[in-house]
């Protein structure tokens, strides 16, 4: 009986649309305040503890000139990691799990909607390609 209920629940879950979050750049700007200790965006952005995040969306990981990336982040980029909405979200959820041995000490953003909002905010500082 339990197996039947579990199977029915799994089948129902597959039929339902995946939850998606609308990206809100204004909310993302608020959430990004957690990131500003180490990162900057905008026309006057400078390298701090972390790299500048202008044009991060679409960039190959570990390649911003003027920032000393960890060997792990450089290797991730060399193996093909590029910063897409999906990869940024996974990285922000748990940076140490996504790229082990990277320098980012941030514990992560656990809420998917906050990650989506930060990505929308970062896109404001990403030039169209």
Feature-to-residue mapping (PLM):
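C-terminal capping alpha-helices of c-type cytochrome domains
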Residues: 82-129
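Electrostatic cytochrome c docking/interface patches
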Residues: 15-32, 42-44
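Positively charged n-region of N-terminal signal peptides that target proteins for export
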Residues: 1-5
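Histidine kinase transmitter module recognition
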Residues: 38-41, 45, 98
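Bacterial N-terminal signal peptides
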Residues: 7-15
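The canonical Cys-X-X-Cys-His
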Residues: 32-41, 118
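Gly/Gly-Pro-rich "capping" loops immediately C-terminal to redox-active cysteine motifs
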Residues: 29, 43-82, 108
């Amino acid at each position: 009986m339990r197996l039947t209920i579990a199977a029915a629940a799994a089948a129902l879950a597959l039929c339902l649309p995946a939850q998606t979050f609308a990206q809100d750049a204004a909310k993302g700007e608020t959430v990004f305040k957690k990131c500003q200790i180490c990162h900057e965006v905008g026309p006057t952005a400078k390298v701090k503890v972390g790299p500048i995040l202008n044009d991060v969306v679409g960039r190959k990981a570990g390649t911003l000139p003027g920032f000393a990336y960890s060997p792990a982040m450089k290797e991730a980029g060399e193996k093909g990691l590029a910063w897409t909405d999906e990869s940024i979200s996974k990285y922000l959820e748990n940076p140490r799990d996504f790229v082990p041995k990277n320098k980012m000490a941030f514990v992560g953003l656990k809420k998917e909607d906050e990650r989506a909002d930060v990505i929308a905010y970062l896109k404001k500082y990403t030039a169209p390609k």
